[in-house]
């Protein structure tokens, strides 16, 4: 009598994630699920969304497969299905950490939070480097044995500084750049070259209080909720597709400085979730919006 494979043995298979968007029509899920079945894959989790406004369909499938299945073989064999449905698709190993670069200026709470979460395995990322236009956090970053890169930025050398960043991204095979309170405005050209690959944390509940000193703007309006917004960076300042938002209730007696203090926590929470979801390939762009399979 042969023993049946245990669940523990099944989970030892290689893990993959397929994400796609395409014009909505009948047969998409059938085509994908049939393909996975015919290639010997097992669906672990599947989420989908059809947007009636844009006419687009979005799908994320987490599946497993035993060797000799490989990611390269899967990509090659899935291409025909992708073409037939005019899909924008990606297929990746789910168990490989995404390589990221963190960028920071003078406020270190988001940087510190991301470094700690990554160090304990709470974020599925590998931090390739931390880049800053100041040297304040070089020692902190060094304590995690992560390379620290000081790239000063002035009006005169901005193009050169961004060229250094792009070179680092390419050399280190970086998939995501995280602006963890990096206070320099990126050029239109850089935003286009890294479109969909830069996440920023803005310290307000967008679309309210854009630009500088949003907590002071919020205080002047007497808000009862303050928030933070993690979004993709575009050439339009603080206008990129929103990924995640977090809020905290405040009373009428709080000062602008107290709002800043409360805001640090919500900034960290919103940014950490956005980075985690991006690294797990749970976010799909839908025009100026996002679809988040959280």
Identify the meaning behind each predicted range.
Residues 1-98:
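A conserved regulatory-domain signal marking ACT and ACT-like small-molecule sensing domains
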């Amino acid at each position: 009598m042969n023993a049946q494979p245990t669940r523990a043995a099944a989970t030892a298979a290689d893990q993959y994630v397929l994400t796609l968007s395409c014009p909505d029509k009948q047969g998409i899920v059938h085509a994908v699920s049939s393909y996975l079945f015919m290639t010997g894959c097992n669906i672990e989790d599947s989420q989908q969304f059809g947007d009636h406004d844009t006419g687009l369909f979005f799908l994320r499938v987490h599946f497993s497969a035993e060797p000799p299945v490989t990611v390269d073989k899967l990509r090659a064999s899935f291409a025909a299905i992708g073409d037939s449905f005019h899909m924008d698709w990606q297929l990746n190993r789910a168990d490989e950490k995404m390589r990221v670069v963190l960028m920071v200026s003078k406020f270190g709470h988001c940087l510190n939070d991301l470094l700690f979460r990554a160090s304990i395995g709470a974020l599925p990322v590998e931090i390739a480097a931390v880049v800053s236009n100041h040297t304040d956090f070089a020692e902190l970053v060094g304590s995690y044995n992560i390379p620290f890169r000081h790239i000063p930025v002035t009006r005169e050398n901005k193009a050169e500084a961004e060229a250094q960043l792009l070179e680092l991204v390419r050399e280190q095979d970086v998939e995501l750049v995280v602006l963890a309170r990096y206070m320099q405005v990126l050029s239109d050209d850089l935003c286009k070259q890294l479109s969909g690959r830069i996440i920023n944390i803005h310290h307000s509940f967008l679309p309210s209080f854009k630009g500088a000193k949003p907590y002071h703007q919020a205080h002047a309006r007497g808000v009862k909720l303050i928030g933070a917004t993690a979004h993709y960076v575009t050439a339009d300042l603080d206008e990129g597709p929103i990924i995640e938002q977090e809020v905290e209730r405040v009373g009428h007696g709080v000062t602008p400085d107290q709002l800043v203090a409360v805001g640090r926590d919500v900034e960290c929470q919103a940014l950490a979730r956005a980075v985690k979801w991006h690294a797990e390939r749970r976010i799909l762009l839908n025009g100026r919006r996002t679809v988040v399979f959280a």
